[in-house]
């Protein structure tokens, strides 16, 4: 498993977790801006929780969210800035039958508006049925 984050602080926490749970033989951590520093390989599954909060919602976030770095939350005007980059690059990193699982929080309307050509499978969670989506490599390949 390759785990990626652009934040050195987030990777420090991840390193502690890897050590605490004895996962060093199964998990490699990479400081990278999305796919930029990943090894050249293809993955069966890519799971991503990018910053997706739109600029209008950023200013209205409850106080407890303000303890999180803005880098971890802010997704640009419509919340889809990094999602666009992920969807564009993911096919190069997904195996032929690979899938992308992407969390977008409460931004489904923005996702649908930004990507009307896509028909993801919306995955149910305990919290909701429209915050986590699955797309195949085939769906992402023009």
Regions found by a protein language model. Name each.
Residues 31, 67, 113:
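Phosphate-coordinating loops and pocket residues in cytosolic domains that bind phosphorylated ligands
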Residues 51-81:
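Mobile active-site "lid"/loop adjacent to the S-adenosyl-L-methionine
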Residues 1-59:
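Conserved SAM/SAH cofactor-binding pocket of Class I
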Residues 139-142:
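Flexible, glycine-/basic-rich loop-and-beta segments that form/coincide
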Residues 28-30, 71, 121:
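Structural signal for short hydrophobic segments within the conserved structured cores
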Residues 77-137:
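Conserved Class I SAM-dependent methyltransferase catalytic core
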